[in-house]
Amino acid sequence: MTHPTELPLSPLSALQFYATAPYPCSYLDGRIARSQVATPSHLINSDIYTELVKAGFRRSGVFTYRPYCDGCRACVPVRVPVAAFAPSRTQRRMWKRHRALVATVSPLHYDEDHYALYMRYQSARHAGGGMDRDSRDQYEQFLLQSRINSRLVEFRDPDAPDGEPGKLRMVSMIDILGDGLSSVYTFFEPDDPHTSYGTYNILWQIEQAKSLGLPYVYLGYWIRESPKMAYKANFHPLEGLIDGRWKVLDPARVDLPPVDAALARAPLPGGHTGSV
């Protein structure tokens, strides 16, 4: 286990960091991945999680991690600087197309309609990946467990004239950080072709961050070699965490080492050091 250097003035000094055993990469076929995990999870509050996200960490339920792969640095943490964001013509069109959707923000909670939509989405978009067989308990552990400031956002069509709720189109989980919003996971109606709900959701988060006076929207990891991640490169400007520093990226020209480059890992937040 990794034992970080004790820093009495740092709220991160009580955390420990360890590397997982190797496992098959879910983004690049034939690759082997590892993660670095921050523990214990009950000590990771919103303030501490903000610092971890700035250092490239993400969460899945109460599991806080970042890529820690041997000889690979393909995963680039990315964020959108809200004040500088300039939507493209296509993004403006998507915003106009879906702006009638009614967004309702609430604490994390279970809803049968949400779970049914999640299963339809997984079956259509990720069939055979395992998540298309998630039980209710697995769904709740993945998306509805959090020890930080998290919200569930439901997007529906406007209510019908008779007062019936509009059709559920999309559900998004977000974390509210000290310096921005962090997009956790989004799923939407897979039977609506060419809707670009995912793009609209990020645009909505950018507007929400702007209204809250928060400077960033964190989008997780961008991988140049992964088609699943391509949409993140459509938001400009886009900042990436490379060699421990956030800098503006040009996804078409970003100077990243190749996937098999020598191991290079970003420093731990708060000046922590450690060994595996």
Swiss-Prot record:
GO cellular component terms, semicolon-separated: cytoplasm
Catalytic activity of the protein: N-terminal L-glutamyl-[protein] + L-leucyl-tRNA(Leu) = N-terminal L-leucyl-L-glutamyl-[protein] + tRNA(Leu) + H(+); N-terminal L-aspartyl-[protein] + L-leucyl-tRNA(Leu) = N-terminal L-leucyl-L-aspartyl-[protein] + tRNA(Leu) + H(+)
GO molecular function ontology, one term from the record: leucyl-tRNA--protein transferase activity
Sequence intervals crossing the membrane: none
Keyword terms: Acyltransferase, Cytoplasm, Transferase
Principal location listed in the UniProt entry: cytoplasm
Disulfide bridge map: none
EC number, UniProt record: 2.3.2.29
Location in or out of the cell: Cytoplasm
SUPFAM superfamilies: Acyl-CoA N-acyltransferases (Nat)
GO terms, biological process: ubiquitin-dependent protein catabolic process via the N-end rule pathway
Keyword Acyltransferase among UniProt keywords: yes
Function: Functions in the N-end rule pathway of protein degradation where it conjugates Leu from its aminoacyl-tRNA to the N-termini of proteins containing an N-terminal aspartate or glutamate.
NCBIfam families: PRK01305.1-1, PRK01305.1-3, PRK01305.2-3
HAMAP family for the chain: Bpt
Family that this chain belongs to: Belongs to the R-transferase family. Bpt subfamily.
PANTHER family per UniProt: ARGININE-TRNA-PROTEIN TRANSFERASE 1, ARGINYL-TRNA--PROTEIN TRANSFERASE 1
Protein name: Aspartate/glutamate leucyltransferase
Species this protein is from: Burkholderia multivorans (strain ATCC 17616 / 249)
